[in-house]
Curated annotation (Swiss-Prot):
Gene expressing this chain: rplP
Quaternary assembly: Part of the 50S ribosomal subunit.
Family: Belongs to the universal ribosomal protein uL16 family.
Designated name of the protein: Large ribosomal subunit protein uL16
Species the sequence originates in: Psychrobacter arcticus (strain DSM 17307 / VKM B-2377 / 273-4)
Pfam (any one): Ribosomal_L16
Length: 137
């Protein structure tokens, strides 16, 4: 699963997910992409589950770009532990997703197959998404 090799600090504040995605909001590498419509968190497991779904659907053809990376650690205290005594250990990694962020891109397969693969992948994700095509200027 995806996670940073090393970080400057082990733990992070919770923070708030506000605003829209300006960077990473256009299809840059492939021809068709999966774009988020709502905000949320995408865990490393969800990124991998969606990637596997796309890979299985398109079989050997085409190329996949994963445009998100889980760089935020989420901590959790064990069950039945009293409050205090510091922040819990890191449990998993997430990527904060803002509306408009491109999550996956595909190229080298038919548009119909790409739409099917991205629709299957979208069902694995905890927020609403849409399929967008690359706009050529």
């Amino acid at each position: 699963m995806l996670q940073p090799k090393r970080t400057k600090f082990r733990k992070m504040h919770k923070g708030r997910n506000t605003g829209l995605a300006h960077r990473g909001s256009t299809v840059a590498f492939g021809q068709i992409g999966l774009k988020s419509l709502t905000r949320g968190r995408m865990t490393a497991r969800q990124i991998e589950a969606a990637r596997r779904t796309i890979t299985r659907k398109i079989k050997r053809g085409g190329k996949i770009w994963i445009r998100v990376f889980p760089d935020k650690p989420i901590t959790n205290k064990p069950l039945e532990v009293r409050m205090g005594k510091g922040k819990g250990p890191v449990e998993y990694w997430v990527c904060e997703i803002k509306p408009g962020k491109i999550l996956y891109e595909l190229e080298g397969i038919s548009e119909e197959l790409a739409r099917e693969a991205l629709t299957l992948a979208a069902s694995k994700l905890p927020f609403k998404t849409t399929i967008v095509k690359r706009t050529i200027m």
